[in-house]
Amino acid sequence: MNPAQILLTNDDGIQSPGLWTAASALSDLGFVNVVAPRDQFSGAGRSLPIYSDGLIDQQKMEVDGRDWNVYAVGGTPAQAVLHAIFEILPEKPILTVAGINYGENLGTGVTVSGTVGAALESATHGIPALAISLETKREYHLSYSPEVDFSTAGFFAAYFGRKLLEKTLPSDVCVLKVDVPCEATPDTPWEITRLSRKIYYHPTPPDRDSWDQPGIPSYEVVGDPLQD
């Protein structure tokens, strides 16, 4: 019997240590197909921009002594999901996992997340999806910093991935979104909650003196992860 096909993607890009922690953690659950954006696409949401080139680069990577065939896609996380479903995987996956993301996805800004966007795109095709993120310091959000320990988040990726394989989500739920606190351990209890309607990532204006200078809006963290 062929192993279950699991799709793994992210928004931080194919080289992200968080992605590879998830790949190793999920490997006991089925055959993990790693199909992720070639580039950093944090903040892409569920966008499907027409200017993406859609190029697919099959690569070989060694992680934890194991060789992986992986696919770097010239597109957003949601587009990576579509390429995986339409062109790459031999059959429709039974589970999609997006992550592990550098930085928590909370509050009203959750729809900006490419991690969540990939999970939502999967769900529209009837594939159960898990989006998982790890709380980190602000300066690590767009990095591949080795200072971040993803091991506990990897444990919960496998834990909740197994739950989704064993049980179906309620009919009114399309995505399971998990945020792992930075100080959590595998023994940390978890609970089901709801998203706050308050701003967690507060947009800030471009840092420039005139419009002919390059600049884009940024953000600062103003919320509390435990805020109601």
Question: What residue ranges belong to the model's regions?
Answer:
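Alpha-helix C-terminal capping segments
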Residues: 84-90, 117-128
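Short acidic, glycine-rich surface-loop motifs adjacent to enzyme active sites
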Residues: 94-103
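Short acidic, Gly/Ser-rich segments with clustered Asp/Glu that frequently serve as metal-coordination loops
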Residues: 12-20, 210-211
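Hydrophobic/aromatic beta-strand patches that form the interior of the parallel beta-sheet core
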Residues: 33-35, 71, 97, 128-132, ...
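Electrostatically charged, flexible surface regions
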Residues: 144, 148-228
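Glycine-rich phosphate/pyrophosphate-binding loops
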Residues: 123-145
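A cross-family phosphate/adenosyl-ligand binding-site feature
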Residues: 2-6, 20-87, 91-92
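Glycine/threonine-rich flexible loop motifs
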Residues: 104-113
